Amino acid sequence: MDVHSSDPSPQPSHPTREKVVVHAAYPLWRKHTLVTLARAKELQDAGNQVAVTYCNATAGTCAVNYGGSPIACMICRNRVKKTAEALGLETIPLSVDGSVDKQLPEILFSEKRAVMEGVQSGVISTFRTLPEESRRNPMIAAIKRRYFRNASRLLKSMKAVVKDRQPDRIEVFNGRHACSRFPIIAARSAGIPFTTLEVTARQFPIVCPGYMVHDRHQIQERILSHPADVDVAERYYLRNRQPRDNKYARKHRTAFVPPDASGYRKRISVFLSSQDEFESLGKEWVSPFLNYGPIVEKACLENPDMMFLIRFHPNQADMASDVLTPFKAVSTLPNAQIFYPTDTVNSYALMEWSDTVVTFGSTITIEACWAGKAAIMLGPSFYDQLEIAYTPKTLEEFGDLLRMDLKPKSPENAARFAHFQEFDHDPLQYVKHTGRTMIENGFRIRHPWLGQLARTTDDLICNAIKLWANHASRSRKSA
């Protein structure tokens, strides 16, 4: 049943030997290193000439080392080098010292902008701040400058490797943050293909030739290639509601007591999303519906004959940016009730209560479709081309849809999505699955405890900065 597992990724046979550069990004993160080096070894076994590049910084700033720790850098370098060498893989260190700035090739303005987008993506994801807040925070702004400098030098070094080695393809894990985006920028600059690697929600490897895993257009094409298996979908959506299988269902176990909706023509549930998650994905994910508070307030005011229940996403509880103040006006309206990020009311019961479900791109959209609910989805998402919800382009279209008696969309593509979630992955020879997670198969990632220690230390530093950013944001709002 593994639709994409019979022929994992384009792997040339010996007669079509290719030169492939695989960059080892995020060396402190176990699954990233596991998938990257397992993939590199498999490519080499298939007859390809493979070289593994890695960051040679001594006190660099990146997505796994925002604190710029020299110890973390030492662990990163040694982890990649020793693990790769044990696998018989050639390694190439990428220099990031000051001398790189004076070397050719130059970095184009468009390439610098792409690096900066990668920096912004990483910073937003880690510190949970929206772009405006991160610009105001001096500590985060300083981190961004160091991160940009490090990634820019990595790009120059990678371009030099590409010029020298003339590879046929570059591969890298993820490709979203600056420290994994620069290989893709180098590939595009040289006019050669790239491949990105990732891990699925069920902890299996996935290979994306020519696109990144957050490319929603390509991912939706992949989803649509799956069968609409009703039995698989039934099991998948039922399991999602079980506390033992879904961390959000586990947190949201409080019984939903519906408000008195007598006198209202329609019951609307509104499910918000974490704005920072969309902001971190780049310009392709820019939404015309980003200002949630005013949008919801307008809908409530224009439709006094409808009852609106608004559910914050639990992930919004950890955001450093202030997401609650924009909903102060909504909280005073007679036809609105708000459930905040830390509220534990059952989201599925809230969805079932509704006549129409409104989302800002969250997974409840596809859950609503499968449950036979009419759903309106505002903004881009991994489901916006699956025909599982109504997708207005403007506020006016949204208002018109709210006032219509909408019919539920066909659940066929919701079933395809379930099959995609359950079975879509690309098995790798040197990766084994325990039933819960991935482990090495036939090799060993070096320095596991040192890597975990360095990662935990950086997490503590980042959490402290995030708390400070949160405090600063709220202080400005109350001033």
Please place each PLM-identified region on the residue numbering.
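C-terminal amphipathic helix plus adjacent low-complexity
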Residues: 1-14, 216-265, 395-479
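Conserved N-terminal ligand/cofactor-binding loop architecture of enzyme catalytic domains
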Residues: 1-19, 23, 42-152, 199-252, ...
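A short, glycine/small-residue-rich beta-strand->loop->alpha-helix junction that serves as a flexible
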Residues: 25-35, 172, 277-283
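Histidine-anchored nucleotide/phosphate-binding helix
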Residues: 29-52, 184, 288-302
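A donor-sugar binding/catalytic signature common to diverse glycosyltransferases
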Residues: 35, 179-181, 342-390
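Donor nucleotide-activated moiety binding/catalytic core segment of transferases
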Residues: 149-163, 283, 306, 315-366
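Conserved nucleotide-sugar donor-interacting segment of glycosyltransferase catalytic cores
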Residues: 154-209
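Conserved catalytic-core segment of nucleotide-activated headgroup transferases in glycan assembly
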Residues: 242-326
